[in-house]
Amino acid sequence: NVFDKIKSVGLAETCKRVFWKVAFKGLRLRNKKMQQFVDENLKVSNQQYNEHDTADSNKYYDTYICGSDQIWNPDLVPTDSMYWLPFVEKGKNKIAYAPSFGASTVTEKQKEQIKANLSTFKAVSCRENSGARTINQIIGEKKCEAVLDPTMLIERDYWDTISEDKIYDEKYIFAYMLRGTAAQRKYIEKIARERNLKIVSIPFLDYEKIDPYDLKFGDYKLWDANPAEFISAIRHAEYVFCDSFHCIVFSILYHRPFFVFPKVGADGKVKKSQISRMTDLLELAEIKNRILLDNEEADLDAEIDWNNSDKRIQKARCDSERYLEQALFM
């Protein structure tokens, strides 16, 4: 029986096995719902290419756009990866839209490879000012400009058509922690108790790192959330706590009060490259005092000038659209 099994392997091992079973079930469901979302909402080619046959696409396409997010982060992706479009034939139009460098430092060898890669692009942009500066330093001229993340090119009305209806009737805090710490989650629980709010969370799942603390964190866990449910969870929250760039994006688009925990490394120190992505976005929207550093308390009643934020994002949206139009048609 179950007690004999616990005795044979130990309580700790039994709990560990139960956790992984729950986590991987959630991961499988999430992947299934994600694919369903893609099938229903994205227009994709009938042919699915991989690294071995991407060159065949030159028969059908004249323009290639790579982006966005951290596709050019040398800490995550090799500088000879497919994200630099090495398979595209000479004379074709290669455009980079809003890739992110992510890394705060780039080695001299990486710089040489990056410079060679960029020489074949017609137009280059980055998602962050810091990334644009890095590229301009590498190539020695100001050809790279900062543009909006693609999710911000689209106004809120469109995302309303994608979003699910309100998932929970009760008032809640939405928590989305890609990594985070137990202390950060406990702080969110403290806020929830003080404000008499529930916690809706999306546990972070991948095949390498799953935080066991997520198993008991939150009143409602969206193990299998798809993008429509992710947007809905932000859209209807009383407060949002996160360490995610895109969670900040949708909090801004939907005018939700949000607070950001900076990501920390294994040494417990804040990752400067990660926080720069967030500070660039907050500076663009002129939103202050949202990143919680050094156990800083959140000012839950601090107001945000959303009207000013919207105007600044709209201007950046127009500038980003202009960049794309010029890259595509001039």
Model-assigned labels for residue ranges:
Residues 1-330:
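Active-site anion-handling motifs in enzyme catalytic cores
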